């Protein structure tokens, strides 16, 4: 239950997609800003209030031309004391994306375990600032928070661990040659 707490998540209209439903399932209210063709600085700057919990950013290429750059979003959000969460579920490879978004200032970044990592389908990584990772842990198993019903099995955790190790050991020159 998010009543009485900040529970609005700002989403750039050009990045609004069906996966936003996961935010609503956790109790968030989405505040969609700008329009599908363009999100302007003043759209973002004027969207923060006492109910704002986070900004959700989706760095997918086909959204990029209508969105503000992540560094700009981070700068504005942090000026308001609001964290930025990046949905990078499908942003691997390149391997550098594992740290790119946090290097650009994002507070949390989520990656799918079941896409390019080739881990279990119902797994993923949450990377970012310790304080936010600890908050995530507070709501998952063995606690009885909102994420309890989506807890990862031991098998999924080990499978994801092995998948990440294999991903990190991959020779990406071969993959890049295939993509060229």
Task: List the model feature ranges, each with a label.
Residues 1-168, 172:
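Conserved PLP-enzyme active-site core in the AAT-like
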